[in-house]
Regions:
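Short loop/turn segments immediately following the C-termini of beta-strands
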Residues: 107-108, 155, 200-202, 245-246, ...
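A short beta-strand motif characteristic of beta-propeller blades
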Residues: 78-85, 122-132, 169-177, 216-222, ...
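Conserved beta-propeller blade signature
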Residues: 101-104, 149-151, 194-196, 239-241, ...
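Short loop/turn segments that connect beta-strands within beta-propeller blades
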Residues: 117-121, 164-168, 210-215, 254-258, ...
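N-terminal intrinsically disordered, acidic low-complexity segments at the extreme N-terminus
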Residues: 1-30
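Beta-rich, blade/repeat-based domains predominating
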Residues: 85-98, 131-146, 178-191, 223-237, ...
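Blade-level signature of beta-propeller repeat domains, shared across WD40, Kelch, NHL, RCC1
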Residues: 326-354
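Blade/loop signatures of beta-propeller domains
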Residues: 56-77
Length: 354
């Protein structure tokens, strides 16, 4: 084929001549691009199909590692309000239902119980009979809901003393069938006026349930290897809460006398160190004073057939400032939901409110 000559004498390129095939190589390249696009599309569709399959399988067959923890509103934790001073190494605290009387035991100094009014003014004392100070170590106190009498345990004498609401001594509590060498410590009442006492005596430490005739009607925990049980509390359903202090546990005994829930030591949220005093409020909250944890843990009591204590939170922290603690030992709650904490080594009782 010869090239045509233009009027200017320049040759016309052969590719411009009519009938010559144009861009054959370009068509092949376009086809290769289309094949690559189809391959990528198929690969993407396969990946999406696999992803959908995995999601469907997970939703159908998934097994949670642990029960879900419900979201807890911040209102489940009280805020610091004020403090009551005037006690030396307070170890126990109780409060009248209306909150107009605060009862505090002292483990040092005069070692008598003190009575304060709602404003933190001392209005009375609870002296053990024939008290000479060092012969007594009062520890925990509880208020009888039926008579407003105040019961105080004495670690040194192994006795429970009873006072009127203003602190006047009434009598020494005795069982209908006395137990030789019993060592009462933690005290609590239920709504019917039954008295719950942690007893450190014997080879098996335990909780005694005592009716209005001073008769032991139930014994809890003898087979659960309790070690220095301190606090005890009872909820409206009849569950009994015990701080098994030296084992670092909070145990919940059901109405059948068996452990239905517990919280122990560990590094996670809500795990205890040295649990001591306990208290319940009308909202089903359980307050646990933890001496080495330097604060108070809050749980929700188990309901229905539940076998767990839901963790609400913690308040406190180590220190001497308002709202911090140095070895809190006891906790109480009044009818209005105010929380009282014996802040032992800060020589005060802190009051928290919702």
């Amino acid at each position: 084929m010869t090239a045509e000559i233009t009027a200017e004498g320049l040759p016309v390129p052969p590719t411009a001549i009519e009938g010559e095939p144009v861009a054959a190589g370009a068509s092949e390249e376009e086809e290769r691009r289309r094949r690559r696009k189809r391959g990528l599309l198929l690969l993407l569709l396969g990946f999406l199909a696999m992803l959908v399959t995995i999601v469907i399988w997970y939703l159908i067959f998934r097994q949670p590692i642990s029960p879900p923890i419900p979201l807890i509103p911040e209102s489940q934790i009280p805020t610091y309000a004020t403090a009551v001073y005037g006690a030396q190494r307070p170890s126990g605290v109780a409060v009248s239902p209306s909150g107009d009387r605060i009862y505090v035991t002292q483990s040092e100094g005069s070692r008598v119980g003190l009575v304060f009014d709602a404003g933190g003014n001392k209005v009375g004392t609870m002296a053990p009979p024939e008290s000479t100070g060092t012969q007594h170590v009062p520890v925990y106190v509880a208020v009888d809901p039926l008579t407003s009498e105040v019961y105080m345990s004495d670690r040194m004498t192994g006795a429970i003393y009873v006072y009127d609401r203003d602190g006047a001594y009434q009598r020494t509590f005795t069982l209908a069938e006395p137990r030789q060498g019993w060592q009462p410590l933690g005290l609590a009442f239920d709504a019917k006026g039954n008295l719950y006492v942690t007893d450190l005596s014997g080879p098996f430490q335990k909780v005694l349930v005592i009716d209005r005739t001073a008769t032991v009607v139930r014994t809890l925990g003898e087979n659960d290897k309790l070690s220095f049980p301190n606090g005890v509390a009872v909820d409206g359903a009849g569950n009994v809460y015990v701080s098994d202090s030296n084992n670092g546990r909070l145990l919940v005994f059901g109405t059948d006398g068996q452990v239905r829930a517990q919280v122990g030591r560990g590094a996670g949220q809500g795990n205890l160190g040295l649990p001591r005093g306990l208290a319940m409020d009308g909202q089903g909250r359980v307050f646990v004073a933890d001496s080495t944890g330097q604060g108070v843990f809050v749980f929700r009591s188990p309901s229905g057939d539940s076998q767990r204590l839901d963790y609400f939170g913690f308040f406190g922290g180590e220190g001497i400032a308002d709202g911090t603690f140095e070895y809190p030992n006891s906790v109480a709650v009044d009818a209005r939901g105010r929380v009282y904490v014996a802040d032992t080594f800060n020589d005060r009782v802190q009051i928290w409110s919702y």
